[in-house]
Amino acid sequence: KVAVLTHWGADNIRYAGISMGKGEGFTLHNLKMNYTDRCGVCKDIAGTLIAFLRMAGFEAFPAMTMAGSRVETIPADHFNHCVAVVKLSDGTMMPLDPTWVPFCRELWSSAEQQQNYLPGTPEGTDLCLTPISDPENHYVRIKAQNTLDEKGTLKGTFTIEAEGQSDSNIRRIFTTGFQSEWAHTMERQLLNVSPKARLKSVDYGRTPKDYQRAPIQITFRYEIPEYALKGDQGEMVFKPFVLNNLYTQVLSY
């Protein structure tokens, strides 16, 4: 339920920084206004989620954080972003950020790990710290099956799979880009490997925009003439395909 409600708020309440006049500050608006307008800033998106969670029977509260920065342990206004927390059955507080997870398979953006936040509970709470997200939550896997002929032409297929922040990065062309650019974007990945690459086909499923269904998976079929060069003794010289400028935007090295 928590995941469903978080993603509904993330995907259906549009971020729009419209001035509401003086004195707004951190004031949370009521659900009727947020649900009717279907837009607002972070506090409106978080406020919608908090109201939904409470209606679903959860204890949920607003929380403040400083996106991208540390919050000092002194009484001062160090906050620039409103998020939400929900109390789990074991009593722990789970941070949720619907503003930063549209089209993302997370509930809190792991681009903001080890970040301070201050829950607004009735009894009061000290500064908290968001947990580290293990690399396994953001894997990228590329499996290729290729053959080289005597002329150095590479033919084959590769499949890329990804999760978490890596999924969001690779899937972005489908969730925020124009559909007319999908095939061109896929082809550009191969052209990064070689300007002679030819994309034969690409399979990204029927609904690549549906990020909640499963981790992203794309299969390419291609041909690259003169991928390998012949040495003086007839040997083939080439760089391993999956290490040759393929999806470099999600590599961490």
Tell where the protein language model's regions lie, with residue ranges.
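A sensor for short, sequence-defined functional sites
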Residues: K1-Y253
